[in-house]
């Protein structure tokens, strides 16, 4: 994982959890002068959510794209979309890292995780467009899919995405309705587990 945390209890908690799960955190910066960024999720009675982001002073944006030799052997390079909106220079580093990963033969997977609260900067939109061109595995929700393609229906949006010759799989997340997996050849609908949801964030 590439990013950054503050040298605070929240940052320590995150690093400890990642380490316990076997994640290599050697490319995570620890900055004693800045606070670990966070996102707060608010829930409403109708089941909708709103995200409040506190990333203005996050050390994560200081992370740099790793050198090519660091990525040797990497088969998939995953990008979490909300990181693109934390800082324009950080977004450029993310794109640079994805480009390096492609050059060594890795696949790029992209979960846009984009909220309307984060969109607006033209320069960031251009980086997003370039990242989409590199993407082999795309993991949007319905709202994100329509937002990113500018289309009115899911079918039109999926068709637009597959104009990218690099795209191999589009996994559309549909919440309580399960998900649909699209490839150029076929579409597969997945089933769902019938549960009483407690918290959908990060599920």
Segments predicted by a language model, with ranges:
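Active-site beta-loop-alpha junctions enriched in small/polar residues
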Residues: 56, 82, 113-115, 143, ...
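Short beta-strand/loop segments at the ligand-binding rim of alpha/beta enzyme cores
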Residues: 105-112
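Structural alpha-helical scaffold elements that stabilize or flank donor/cofactor-binding regions
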Residues: 69-70, 130-131, 163
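Conserved phosphate-binding/catalytic region of the ribokinase-like
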Residues: 99, 103, 151-203
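Structural recognition of alpha->loop->beta junctions
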Residues: 19-23, 122-148
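Charged helix-capping and loop-helix junction motifs
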Residues: 90-96, 121-129, 152-158, 192
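Conserved N-terminal subdomain of the carbohydrate kinase-like
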Residues: 2-81
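Glycine-centered short loops/turns at secondary-structure junctions
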Residues: 22, 103-105
């Amino acid at each position: 994982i590439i990013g950054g945390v503050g040298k605070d209890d929240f940052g320590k908690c995150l690093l400890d959890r990642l380490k316990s799960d076997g994640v290599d955190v050697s490319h995570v910066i620890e900055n004693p002068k800045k606070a670990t960024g966070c996102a707060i999720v608010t829930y409403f009675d109708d089941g909708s959510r709103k995200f409040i982001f506190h990333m203005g002073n996050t050390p994560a944006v200081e992370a740099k794209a790793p050198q090519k030799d660091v990525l040797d052997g990497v088969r998939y390079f995953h990008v979490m979309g909300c990181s693109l909106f934390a800082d324009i220079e950080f977004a450029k580093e993310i794109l640079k890292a994805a480009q390096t990963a492609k050059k060594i033969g890795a696949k790029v997977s992209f979960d846009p995780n984009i909220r309307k609260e984060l969109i607006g900067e033209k320069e960031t939109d251009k980086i997003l467009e370039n990242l989409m061109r590199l993407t082999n595995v795309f993991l949007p929700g319905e709202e994100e899919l329509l937002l990113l393609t500018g289309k009115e229906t899911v079918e039109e949006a999926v068709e637009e995405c597959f104009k990218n010759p690099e795209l191999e799989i589009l996994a559309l997340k549909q919440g309580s309705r399960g998900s649909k997996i699209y490839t150029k050849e076929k579409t597969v609908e997945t089933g769902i587990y019938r549960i009483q949801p407690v918290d959908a964030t990060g599920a």
